[in-house]
Amino acid sequence: MIYENSFLLETSDLIADDDAILLSNNRNEFFSFSANTGALNWQQKINSNIRPTLIENLIFTVTIEGFLVVIDNKTGNIIRITNVFDKIKKNKRSKIKPVGFIVGTKNIYLTTDNGLLILIDISSGRSSSILKVDNEKISRPFILNKNLFIIKDNSIIKLN
């Protein structure tokens, strides 16, 4: 009998600062490696395959299940975990996957694979509003000249 365990590994983009290289994957692993030696600084059990964001000493990431996780970059300690899918009906949550996010001064802007743009209050970590942009996957948001842009299919959506 031959047993095969096929598993598609999806990793986040790498991000780095002067001391560490950070990445996560969909196998419940989030890593910090030394930028100088390549040695493991710390590891956490966080299930995310989207690009994390590093601001000063804080790492922001969103799990595949829809939890915003804030981590201390030096120690790897989890500072806060909040459910950002809390305003979405429970029976629909498992069908929604985060695509990407950006961190603004007051909000985190999270896009999903079913066309939602979720605004998350940065101080509380809770979703403050949800906008339906499309019925299908939309891109990770980006900001240019104080405007938010999202790509969907063959078009670019500009939000003020």
Label each residue range with its predicted role.
Residues L23-N25, F31-S34:
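Structural recognition of beta-strand segments within beta-rich domains
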Residues L54-I55, T61-I71, N77, I81-I120:
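Loop/turn-rich, solvent-exposed surfaces of beta-rich toroidal or solenoidal domains
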